[in-house]
Amino acid sequence: MVMSNVFICHHSKDVPKLRDLLDKLKAKGYTVKSSSLQEDRDNKVVHKGKHVADATVARYIRSAIRWAGTFIVLIGEHTHERPWVNYEIRNAHFQGKKIIGVYVHGCAQDAELPEAYKRYGTSPIGWNSIDKLGGMIEGKVEPAELPDGSASNGNIYQMIYIKCK
């Protein structure tokens, strides 16, 4: 089994669950980075008390995603509202990364998936199915789940059809 570098994308309100997931992945031997950056009340990234330019944040995120073999999106009730989350997912897709969604423990059944995840992500799994994550990182395909870990009807993807000439 080859261990993979893993990048975790998340909403800042889900940091406690992020820490739980980081601990579980590290215990299994994975090297993990996350998109955790210090933000002020206006959701602007700060470092040593100063605002950081969006271009600098974007460069950091692209670099961290490039480093990773697998990209995980921690999906909470408000994850879909964050522009940086969609930015990170799109970048992971453009860099050819496997994109796996994990619902936050206790997440509402009707948690909305980020738009970019609907387009580029794999089948999401519930927090109670976190043991499946290692297999998914290694390429195993799992059926889509709802936040509680029960089977989804599978209708989560926006299908885009093109006609080739």
Outline where the language-model segments fall.
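Short, structured coil segments at secondary-structure junctions
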Residues: 28, 95, 117-121
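Inter-motif core of Ras-like GTPase G domains
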Residues: 68-73
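A short helix->loop->beta-strand "cap" motif at the edges of active sites that frequently abuts
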Residues: 94-100
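C-terminal interaction surface of TIR/SEFIR-family domains
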Residues: 4-7, 52, 106-165
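Conserved N-terminal substructure of TIR/SEFIR domains
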Residues: 1-67, 151-165
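Short beta-strand/turn micro-motifs composed of small residues
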Residues: 10, 75, 103
